[in-house]
């Protein structure tokens, strides 16, 4: 699966849907249970590598002799009460505090807790402002120079946020920011704009500018989004994530010169980040500075961007845009002359 014949790699994936591209809506208060078994099996090559339906039937028949389906169902029934619903005797790893926060919210609302047999611990530092909101009706002070520790797009917190913002925390930029972000996730753009404008008036803060940029992106206003994204990066010049976000927004708005100026103003250690170098190459292609862009992409045997996501096509798109302009050809013809290098091609097909 890695694409390199010299790499020994196997990946096991399982789920209820047929493929990764599908999803199954899960109704509230529903439990889905299943049991999986993994192991080796032998079968005749002629059967396994023959027609699909025949191969499928051969594998199913062989598996039925190794571990019958009814045996799996029996094990599932047996373990439902003896294991799945039994409180743990030893805790090996503590998870995040979000489950604990939800149990706290449920207790305040008079609702039953999450799975009572599970130990969700207590809310931690990330959940501290939300715990304070539940218990005291106020999130408390927050340093605008520090990254926002958490966001909670849960409509059930909206009334609490609104009450705090209109009352005891009317001068608290962080409460207004969280209210604006929550409204944004609910599609209430006009209300979100008002809340974020209030937050922006209370503090010069990268995270407020970031949220304002997201608002304008969602409203298909790339130029306004770019203004706030640039301001966010200027307010947090040492933050790599803000710089990467700002560059993406500027490039989407085709403000290539602004993107290069932002990179030039960044600290050297951020300028050298592979994702920033990729954005620089993209901006250079947009400005027809093709040799400079190609030099970045091909440096040291080819640019490697560790934080690129599976299926993300940014690298291949930048490469092909460069080749189209370089040769003056349509995309397909340019790719025949200069195919996307192996190290840059993350396309799924």
Where are each of the predicted segments found?
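A contiguous, surface-exposed recognition patch within enzymatic or periplasmic domains that forms
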Residues: 1-24, 30, 84-99, 103-118
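Short Pro-Gly-centered flexible turn/kink motifs
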Residues: 25-42
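Alpha-solenoid helical repeat scaffolds
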Residues: 174-178, 207-211, 241-245, 274-279, ...
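Short coil turns that delineate tetratricopeptide repeat
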Residues: 169-170, 203-204, 237, 271, ...
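TPR/TPR-like (Sel1-like) alpha-helical repeat modules
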Residues: 268-274, 282-308, 334-338
